[in-house]
Amino acid sequence: MDSPFTDVAVLLTGVGKRYDIVSAFAQHATVIAADPNPLAPAQYAAQHRRAVPRIDDPDYVPALRALCDEFGVGAVVPLTDLDLEVLAVARAAGQLPAFVPDPEIARATFDKYGTHLLLQRHGLPSPPTVLPGEPVEHFPVMVKPRWGSGARSIHRADDIHAAEFFVHYIAEAAMVQWFMDGPEFSMDVLSDLDGRCLNVIPRTMLESRGGE
């Protein structure tokens, strides 16, 4: 039976190797897969594929806008967090129908320390987190890059000497966060463009490959 949504065009960005996700979208919509890598494997699960400029290229958003016009795209959905802020700014400016949060939220979620402060402002629990040079009151801790994703360059430190070593070892802006032991849970939240929560899917994180 044909899906009633096959006439809906969805532009997926940063498809990379996320073949299963692209394939799932393609079963219910006309999918345009966009990635800077013209050989990205997941693009072959879509009905249409396009190589686009890199996220940091000023022509990135205009290229996506052109694809929206060409295919009548009703939704731009990023499959990576790397372009969240870029798409959020474009959405706020009325350039793209992107399914992303407001720019302030997108900016904070890519900045782990910014996320910590955002959670605190809203009265939500967050592990004690400090920047290098600030006092650490509890060990062990995790030393990790302040910006970025993919569970990269994360190191456990059991004392202040190890923490100071790893702060310099990762060679980029770092933060120090209380080590949280026990099972890790990830919550996938589906919301509409007005920020209303439609569904939440909790998952136990058994393994992380590139943050997924």
Regions found by a protein language model. Name each.
Residues 41-45, 59-62, 106-114, 153, ...:
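Short, charged, surface-exposed secondary-structure boundary motifs
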Residues 49-55, 129-132, 155-158:
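Short acidic-hydrophobic, aromatic-tinged amphipathic segments that line or gate anion-handling sites
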Residues 66, 112-118, 191-194:
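Short, surface-exposed amphipathic charged segments that create phosphate/polyanion-binding patches used
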Residues 104-128:
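Glycine-/Pro-rich loop/turn segments that contact NAD(P) or position catalytic residues
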